[in-house]
Amino acid sequence: MTTQPSKQLETFENPIQTRDYRIHMEIPEFTCLCPKTGQPDFARLTLDYIPDKKCIELKSLKLYIWSYRNEGTFHEAVTNQILDDLVIAMKPRFIRLTSKFYVRGGIFTNVVAEHRKKGWHPQPPVFLESFDEQFNTRS
């Protein structure tokens, strides 16, 4: 059982390479240190990506995220570094990382970074009518 943080991201083969589909992940407990004060910064990371040939392995992602816990870094830098490392590991068709940092000095900071694979174009969205919430009994 691994009990140490790691910068090593692992991947596995995308089981459905013929289709664009979105993988959505929420990482509610990201921490790093403010490079100016050494105080902890906390953020909720949201990762959305459309894989190409590889997907990110979750345990390695957890250990990778953990590796920033004692690292001093600016919000903008860490968001872009994480995105760059994920792009190198997976080479996805599309990836977006949103970092929502908790209040610091009365200011909330949100950083959004994204990458599109050269030559990839998303399919146009399909909007479907919503249904009312369903219950197991009819009224």
From Swiss-Prot:
One GO CC annotation? cytoplasm
Q: InterPro entries under this entry?
A: GTP-CH-I_C/QueF, NADPH_dep_7-cyano-7-deazaG_red, QueF, QueF_type1
Broad class of the protein's primary localization: cytoplasm
GO terms of molecular function = preQ1 synthase activity
Entry annotation: catalytic residues: C34, D41
One GO term (biological process):
tRNA modification
Tell me where it resides: Cytoplasm
Quote the SUPFAM superfamilies the UniProt record gives.
Tetrahydrobiopterin biosynthesis enzymes-like (SSF55620)
**Keyword terms of this UniProt record:** Cytoplasm, NADP, Oxidoreductase, Queuosine biosynthesis
Please report the name of this protein according to its UniProt entry.
NADPH-dependent 7-cyano-7-deazaguanine reductase
Q: Which gene encodes it?
A: queF
